[in-house]
C-alpha cells in the first residue's frame, strides 16, 4: 500500500496533512477525499454566501487527485428596503 497526503483547503486556509494515510488504490484515495470534503462542508457550511473547499491529494512528491466543492448562495429575491 502507498501513503497519500490529503491537504485541505477552506478558501485561503490550508491544512497540510503531514502524516498521510495508506491506501490500497486510487479508488480508496477518491473515497477518502470525498468523505473528507463532505465532512469539511458539514463543519463550515453555511457560514458564508460563497465558499470554496478542496482536498488535494499527493504522494509526497507528485499530485494525485484534486476534489473541489464550491458553495454559492444566490439570492433571487432581495430583502425589502426599510426607510
Predicted regions: what is each one?
Residues 46-83:
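C-terminal structural segments of small proteins and small subunits
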Residues 16-24:
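A short, exposed loop/beta-hairpin motif centered on an aromatic-Gly-Thr core
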Residues 30-43:
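Charged, amphipathic alpha-helical segments
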Residues 1, 40-49:
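Short linear motifs in intrinsically disordered
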Residues 1-16:
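Short aromatic-glycine-(Arg/Gly/Cys) micro-motifs in beta-strand/loop hairpins
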